C-alpha cells in the first residue's frame, strides 16, 4: 500500500503551527508530550494509516518546527490552535490522542468542540496533586540550562539528563531523537510543563462526555497518575501496556498501535 505523507503550516496566535498528515482515512489527531514533537509518534504513522486513519500529528507551539510563543501559553491556548487546524482542514468526526501534556490538550479540546469529536485517547494523563506538580516544576526549573561548549560536553550533559528522567530506557533511536527535540527547543521547554501544571485536569476529566480510553504503560514515569485518572473516571476504558517508558510508542509500536486501533474502530 502506498501511504502518502505531507507536511504543512497554518498561522496561529503564536506564529506558524507545523503539522504532518499521513494517510487518507478517518482523521486522528496526535498531540505530543513535553519536551518533544510530532516525531515521537513517527513510527506509528504508517501502521495507523494502513489501519484506515488519516494521521494528523501536530508540533505544539514552541516545539518541533512550530514557532515559539512570545508569552506563556495555557492549555486552552494550545487547544485553540488545534481547533483552528480542525476548522482549516474542515474535519468532522475526529478522534484525538494526546500523550502527557498532549493528553491535557486533547482533553480540553474535547470540551470545546464535542460535536466534532468521535473518540478520545488520553495516553498517560498527568492527573497530579498540587504538591506533585510543584516538586516536578522545581526539578525542571533547577535543571542546568544548556550552553554550547567548544568540547561538545553540553551534548553529553543533555544525554545524561534525558537518561535520568527515562529510567529503564531500551530504545537507543528514541533516546537520540528525544535529544534532537530537546536541542530544538534550546532550553525553552518549560512552556509546555507550566501550561499542563496550571490546568485543572481533574475538572476537565470530570466534564468529558464522549467515549474515552486512558492508555498507559507500567514503566511510564507518571503511571500512577493515569491510575488516578482511571479511579476518577471508572467509566473510561483503561488499558495498560507492560513496561516501557515515556518512549512507549517507539518501544512497543505494534502493541501501542493495536491498542489505539481497537478502541477507535470498536464503535
Regions found by a protein language model. Name each.
Residues 1-16:
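N-terminal cap/lid segment of alpha/beta-hydrolase-fold proteins
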Residues 13-14, 18-65:
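Conserved HGGG/HGGXW glycine-rich cap/lid loop of the alpha/beta-hydrolase fold
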Residues 42, 50, 57-97, 101:
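Active-site loop/oxyanion-hole signature of alpha/beta-hydrolase fold enzymes
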Residues 107, 111-112, 118-149:
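Flexible "cap/lid" loop of the alpha/beta hydrolase fold
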Residues 131-132, 149-206:
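Conserved alpha/beta-hydrolase catalytic His-Asp/Glu region
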Residues 196-209, 218, 227-230:
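Serine-hydrolase catalytic core
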Residues 212-250:
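Conserved loop-alpha-helix segment in the C-terminal half of the alpha/beta-hydrolase fold
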Residues 249-262:
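Post-His helix in hydrolase/transferase enzymes
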